Regions:
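Flexible, glycine/charged-enriched surface loops at secondary-structure junctions
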Residues: 151-159, 174-184, 199-204, 222-225, ...
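Short beta->alpha junction loops
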Residues: 5-15
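Glycine-rich phosphate/pyrophosphate-binding beta-alpha loops
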Residues: 85, 190-228, 323-327
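Carboxylate- and glycine-rich phosphate/diphosphate-binding segment that chelates Mg2+/Mn2+
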Residues: 93-199
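Short, amphipathic C-terminal "tail helix"
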Residues: 303-353
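Glycine/threonine-rich beta-strand-loop-alpha-helix active-site module
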Residues: 16-23, 27-122
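Gly/Pro-rich interdomain helix-loop hinge
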Residues: 214-217, 221, 225-308, 312, ...
Length: 353
């Protein structure tokens, strides 16, 4: 079997990396593309695959939601995941960063769902603790957002709920070095991916996509999983103003067993928010952007200056509203509400609107 290796994919892969990889594919002309690693290399390979199959396709064309032409005319795709969070090995999504604009763009189309996914828990056993924390909370966010998404259904709900139950039991243990828990987390994140690839996501991801690289000129990124972990409790509080979403959060809490089943839905939502914030503490993840250090750990003064955040707030909010994940959120925010929500995520203030 003749092979060619393309490596060196950076975290949060860039448009430029995608184009270089696509050039390498066009020279080698593979029948199969095998992407090995975490979310970044697999996501990058998905975008390269599109460009390989359609050389005239621009990055802007790729970003048109469910607008990718039929693939597999040149190659099939196999994904081998080595981290326990993105589940990109089973999803219709890829996240690519345009560093010139400081924006992460989701490519969303069922055409880019891999033909084969190899989910081997042993590959995740060497993950560093920080990666365990961030990818694990990414998976938790996938499952919760999928369950309350407007596109949820009878086929996705069991996957989402079981993933939540598994992550609740195993993530902190995995973080603290329990290898059996880490093995189970690898399966849990895949279940969460199967749920959200069909039920879609919500504005936690919209906000994470649009803040992740927005402050890269200040020397760091807001790592995707950490962003999800910080924003998820705030978005739950925002979405719970919608009665349907509030009831579904209540069902999640019933399965988790973290509140009395006879408690009100409002009390159950509060219990869920409290539980997730406690998880963030256990995983050494900050509660807000203001306290997000350049190394992703909690600090008194984070790397994003307040004046810079406020200066860029409106544009980030507009971009988040336009993100592919916003349409399936259970409560549709206005630009003004998105700005207020982002402020709550910066200062760690209560969501009361």
């Amino acid at each position: 079997m003749e092979v060619s290796i393309f490596d060196g994919i950076e975290p949060d892969p860039s448009v430029e990396t995608v184009m270089k990889g696509a050039d390498a594919m066009m020279k080698f002309q593979p029948d199969w593309i095998v992407a090995i690693g975490g979310g970044s290399p697999i996501d990058a390979a998905k975008a390269m695959w599109i460009k390989y199959e359609y050389p005239d396709c621009t990055f802007e064309d790729m970003c048109k939601v469910f607008g990718i032409p039929e693939l597999r005319k040149k190659a099939h795709f196999c994904a081998v995941s080595s981290t326990s969070g993105t589940a990109t090995e089973v999803t219709a999504f890829s996240i690519i960063t345009d560093y010139n604009k400081g924006i992460k763009y989701p490519i969303a189309d069922f055409e880019i769902t891999p033909d084969v996914a190899i989910v081997d828990p042993e590959l995740a056993e060497t993950m560093p603790k920080k990666l365990v924390a961030h990818t694990g909370m990414d998976a938790m966010t996938h499952a919760i957002e999928a369950y309350v998404s407007t596109a949820n259904c009878d086929y996705t709900d069991p996957l989402a709920i079981h993933a939540i139950e598994m992550i609740m039991k195993d993530l902190t243990a995995s973080y603290n070095g329990d290898m059996e828990a880490r093995d189970r987390m690898h399966n849990a994140q895949c279940l969460a991916g199967m749920a959200f690839s069909n039920a879609l996501l919500g504005i936690v991801h919209s906000m994470a996509h649009k803040t992740g690289a927005a402050f890269a000129d200040y020397g760091a990124h807001i790592i995707h999983g950490a962003a999800n972990a910080m924003y998820l409790p705030k978005v739950i509080a925002f979405n719970a103003k919608d009665e349907t979403a509030k009831k579904r959060y209540g069902v999640i809490v019933d399965y988790m067993g973290i509140a009395d089943k006879n408690a009100s839905d409002d009390d159950k939502v509060s219990a869920l928010i409290t539980y997730l914030r406690k998880m963030n503490d256990e995983l050494n993840i900050p509660h807000c952007i203001k306290n997000y250090g350049a190394d992703s750990y909690p600090v008194e003064n984070g790397f994003v200056p307040e004046n810079v955040f406020l200066e860029r707030l409106h544009d980030i909010a507009v971009n988040a509203i336009g993100d592919a994940c916003t349409g399936s959120n259970p409560r549709q925010p206005s630009v003004e509400e998105m700005e207020k929500l982002l402020k709550c995520c910066y200062y760690d203030t209560e969501v009361d609107f």
